[in-house]
C-alpha cells in the first residue's frame, strides 16, 4: 500500500491462478504496487566512470566555450585567440562536466544556463560578470534522440538546444537566447526579459568543420582583409501581395533600418535592393535582384540585411538567393548577415540550413549571422 509515500505498508495477499485477493479497510481511495518477490530483479551494472570536475571552483571568466571532448582542441585554439587578441579570460568546458554538476548527470539544456547563472550571481560580490557564451557544436530539436529522424545522426559533437513549449510549426522555435536570461525569475517571457550576455553557436559537427571555422574566425579577427568594403552595407527587401497581407511591409521595414544607418553612421555607403524596384520575369522570378546581390557580395559588404519571406533553403518565394548560391560562392570579403525572415538559419534540424551554410563555407559566405 503506497497511498502514503512516507508510510508504505506491506499487504498480505492470496494468489489463486490469475486472481489476486486481499483485504484492506475501505473508506478512501488507495494506491497499490504489486511486487513479485519470486522474480529476478535487474542488477545495477557499471556503464562507465564519471570524471571528476570542479566547475564550481572556477574563477570568474569573461567567456565560456562549451565543447564536446573531440572538439576541445579546436575550441581551445579559439580560446587562445580571444585571450591573446581580445584580452578575455576564457574557459573551455565539456557538456558532460556541466551535466554532472548542474543537472545530476542528466543531459539537460538548462544545465548550460545554470552554469552561466552561477558566474552571473557571483559577479555581484566578485565583479567581472560573464560576457560571452559560445556553444561549440550543432544542435538538434530532439534532445533525447528518440525520434526516427535523428537515429542516424552522430551525437558525439552535438550540444543540446532550448525548445519552446509550443510544438505547432507556426509557433515552435529553438533559441540560444534562453541561456543568457540570468536575472532571477527571468526566462519565461522572451519579449520582456533582458539577455545578460552575448550568446552564439558554431553549428559544427566534425573536427574538420571545427578546424575550418576556427581558421575562418581567427583570420577575420586578424583583420588582414581591411579596406573600403567595410563601409558598405546592403538592405534587401522582399515584395508583398494581397494574399500574404504584407504588400509593402517588408520594403518599409528595410527602409526604416537603412535610413537609421544613414542617420547614425553617415560614413557608411548604404545599398538598397528592393524587389519591387526590379522587373519580374515571365517565370515570376527576379533575376536582376539575384544578380545585384551577387555583385554587391563580390564587391564586399560589412553587413547584408534581408527582410522578407524565407525558408531553410532560400530567400523569398522567388528564390532570389539560395543555399546552392551560398555553397558555390567564392567572394572573399565576409559580411555579417542579418535575416529577418523565417527558418533560414534553423540550427536544430538534421539537415544543414542555408544560414548554417553561410557560416560553414570555409572561405566565403559570411563571418556571423543574426537571424
Question: Which residues fall in each region the model found?
Answer:
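Cysteine-dependent hydrolase recognition
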Residues: 1-371
Amino acid at each position: 500500500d503506497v497511498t502514503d509515500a512516507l508510510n508504505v505498508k506491506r499487504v498480505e495477499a492470496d494468489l489463486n491462478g490469475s486472481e489476486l485477493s486481499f483485504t484492506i479497510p475501505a473508506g478512501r481511495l488507495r494506491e497499490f504496487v504489486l511486487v513479485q518477490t519470486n522474480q529476478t530483479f535487474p542488477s545495477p551494472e557499471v556503464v562507465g566512470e564519471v570524471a571528476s570536475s570542479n566547475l564550481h571552483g572556477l574563477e570568474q571568466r569573461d567567456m565560456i566555450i562549451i565543447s564536446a571532448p573531440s572538439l576541445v582542441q579546436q575550441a581551445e585554439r579559439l580560446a587562445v585567440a580571444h585571450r591573446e587578441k581580445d584580452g578575455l579570460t576564457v574557459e573551455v568546458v565539456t557538456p558532460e562536466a556541466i551535466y554532472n554538476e548542474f543537472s545530476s548527470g542528466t543531459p539537460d539544456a538548462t544545465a548550460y544556463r545554470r552554469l552561466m547563472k552561477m558566474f552571473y550571481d557571483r559577479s555581484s560580490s566578485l565583479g567581472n560578470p560573464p560576457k560571452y557564451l559560445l556553444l561549440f557544436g550543432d544542435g538538434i530539436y530532439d534532445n533525447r534522440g528518440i525520434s526516427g529522424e535523428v537515429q542516424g545522426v552522430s551525437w558525439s559533437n552535438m550540444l543540446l538546444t532550448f525548445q519552446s513549449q509550443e510544438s505547432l510549426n507556426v509557433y515552435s522555435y529553438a533559441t540560444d537566447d534562453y541561456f543568457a536570461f540570468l536575472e532571477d525569475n527571468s526566462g519565461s517571457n522572451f519579449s520582456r526579459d533582458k539577455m545578460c550576455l552575448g550568446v552564439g553557436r558554431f553549428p559544427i559537427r566534425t573536427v574538420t568543420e571545427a578546424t575550418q571555422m576556427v581558421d575562418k574566425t581567427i583570420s577575420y579577427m586578424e583583420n588582414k582583409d581591411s579596406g573600403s568594403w567595410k563601409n558598405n552595407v546592403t538592405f534587401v527587401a522582399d515584395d508583398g501581395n494581397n494574399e500574404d497581407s504584407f504588400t509593402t511591409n517588408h520594403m518599409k521595414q528595410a527602409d526604416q533600418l537603412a535610413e537609421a544607418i544613414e542617420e547614425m553612421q553617415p560614413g557608411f555607403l548604404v545599398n538598397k535592393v528592393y524587389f519591387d524596384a526590379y522587373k519580374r520575369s515571365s517565370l515570376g522570378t527576379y533575376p536582376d535582384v539575384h544578380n545585384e546581390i551577387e555583385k554587391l557580395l563580390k564587391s564586399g559588404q560589412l553587413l547584408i540585411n534581408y527582410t522578407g519571406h524565407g525558408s531553410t533553403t532560400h530567400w523569398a518565394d522567388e528564390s532570389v538567393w539560395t543555399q546552392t548560391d551560398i555553397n558555390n560562392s567564392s567572394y572573399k570579403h565576409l559580411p555579417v548577415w542579418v535575416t529577418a525572415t523565417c527558418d533560414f538559419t534553423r540550427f536544430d534540424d538534421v539537415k544543414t540550413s542555408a544560414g548554417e551554410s553561410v557560416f560553414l563555407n570555409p572561405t566565403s559566405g559570411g563571418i556571423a549571422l543574426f537571424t
